[in-house]
Every structure is written in structure tokens, then in C-alpha cells.
Regions:
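Hydrophobic alpha-helical bundle signature of multipass membrane enzymes
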Residues: 2-167, 180-189, 195, 199
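Membrane-embedded catalytic cores of phosphoryl/pyrophosphoryl-handling enzymes
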Residues: 11-13, 140-266
Length: 266
């Protein structure tokens, strides 16, 4: 059933179509990798891995909190709601991200899929996956450190990253964070024609997703399912934002700014 809003608002179906288009863009890379049959193996170029590591760190605590605050502030500026509506939007944005992370944790605990680097540890260092995950998190990190102490083909920063990230793989929490923000951009900012912001968010989210694959943290299916969950949550969050905070379409004054921006871009 389509939930209709005020005359100035969009219905749920229109919002879902828009965010689905964004989700489809994000799914291109992981689906292509999945279909290709690519499997992660250690030994990639250290400089390239370091770049990917810093991309993934934009989502990892504490940097992820800073990213969240910056994006919230930018969205509030772009939408230019009044104070009460802005505070409500801030709560909706934060709620969408937190609920997504909660869903991720629940699914991880029930599916219990091992990370690619843990599967590799079993093959290369004879560390059984079941025994690894039966350990407490602190002990898992210590085991990774011990087993890879002499593994010079794996950069030190990546070994430390693995020591911290010893949880289950499915779905990808980093992907859910980045994909949620990218899709919130599509859902909330497209009516304001913030195309540059949307493009940057989509590229950034795809970069985060790729980094999770190449750092040995996730399988392609982890990224696909995380993106689909994000799409569902963001579609609802966008609909709530318009219903509670007001129409996403710009007022007449801002329409003039958009027209001027479009002319300068052309």
C-alpha cells in the first residue's frame, strides 16, 4: 500500500524508486565481483592496501563518529530546515544509522559467517575456524598477532586491523554505514539537486565496500545484503523525514539558486 503524504510531498513508492536507483549503482561492483568468482588472497601491493585502509577508516571508530557528525551537518545545511525540523532530521539520520548497525549485529550473531582472512588462517596456519570463533574477542586478536608475527608479506597496519576486527563477516557493518549515507543523499538531497554531493557519497561508499573486500574482511555477498538492508531502512527514513520535517522539494528562493547552479555546471 502506498502511503500518501501532503500535496507537496512524495509517496513512498516515489521515494523507493529513487533510493532503489542509488542502491542499484552501489550493487554494481559487489555483484560483478560475486559473479566473477573472485576470491580474496593476501599479498596485494602495500601502498594500495594502505590507501584502502584509510578509506575503510572513515567508517571505523572513532573516525566513523566524526564522519557521521560532518555528514549530518552538511545534510542539515543542504536542506535548510528550521530549527525544530532540523533537530528532528538529525534524530532521524542518527536513528537510521543506529538501527542499521543494530540489525547488522543481530544478523552477524545468528549467521556467524567467518571473515575471509580467518578462512585463510585456517588454510595457511592451521587455525580451525570453529576454534578461532570459540575464543573471546581479546584472545582472537592475540592469536592473530601470534600467528602473523613473521608474516612479512602482510603489512603491519593490516595485521593490526585484523587483530581488532575478529568478529563475524555477514553482513558488512562498514558497508551499511557508508551505503546508508549514500542512499540518504539520494533520498533527501536529490530533490535539491545536490548532484555533486550525491556523486561523492556514492563513490565514497563504493570505495568503502571495495576496501572491505581487498582487506580480507568481507565476501561480496556481505556487501550485497548490507546494501539491500540499508536501502530498506533509508527508504523508510526518507519518508519519515518528509512526513515529519516537511517537503524535500526546495522553496522558491532555493529553486532560483538551483537554477543558477545548474547553469554554472553547464
Amino acid at each position: 500500500m502506498i502511503v500518501m503524504l501532503s500535496e507537496k510531498g512524495e509517496d513512498m513508492l516515489s521515494i523507493a524508486r529513487r533510493t532503489a536507483a542509488g542502491a542499484a549503482i552501489l550493487l554494481i561492483m559487489p555483484l560483478a565481483v560475486w559473479v566473477s568468482g573472485w576470491m580474496w588472497q593476501p599479498g596485494q601491493n602495500a601502498t594500495w592496501l594502505k590507501t584502502l585502509y584509510w578509506i575503510t577508516e572513515t567508517v571505523t571508530q572513532p573516525w566513523g563518529i566524526i564522519t557521521h557528525v560532518i555528514l549530518c551537518a552538511w545534510f542539515l545545511w543542504c536542506l535548510r530546515f528550521r530549527l525544530r525540523a532540523a533537530l528532528m532530521l538529525f534524530a532521524i539520520l542518527g536513528g537510521a544509522i543506529l538501527i542499521g548497525q543494530g540489525v547488522k549485529s543481530w544478523v552477524k550473531d545468528h549467521v556467524q559467517e567467518p571473515r575471509p582472512f580467518v578462512v585463510w588462517l585456517e588454510k595457511a596456519h592451521h587455525v580451525p575456524v570453529d576454534e578461532f570463533y570459540n575464543l573471546k574477542r581479546k584472545d582472537r586478536g592475540a592469536l592473530v598477532k601470534e600467528q602473523l608475527a613473521e608474516q612479512q608479506d602482510i603489512p603491519k597496519f593490516l595485521r593490526k586491523h585484523w587483530q581488532k576486527e575478529t568478529g563475524f563477516a555477514f553482513p558488512s557493518g562498514h558497508t551499511m554505514f557508508a551505503a546508508s549515507w549514500a542512499l540518504l543523499g539520494v533520498g533527501l538531497l536529490w530533490p535539491r539537486r545536490r548532484t555533486v554531493t550525491i556523486a561523492i557519497l556514492l563513490v565514497w561508499a563504493t570505495g568503502v565496500m571495495g576496501s572491505r573486500l581487498l582487506l580480507g574482511m568481507h565476501w561480496p555477498r556481505d556487501l550485497v545484503v548490507a546494501t539491500l538492508i540499508s536501502w530498506l531502512l533509508v527508504t523508510l527514513a526518507t519518508w519519515l523525514a518528509e512526513r515529519i520535517c516537511g517537503p524535500l522539494t526546495p522553496p522558491p528562493v532555493e529553486e532560483e539558486e538551483i537554477a543558477e547552479r545548474d547553469q554554472s555546471d553547464a
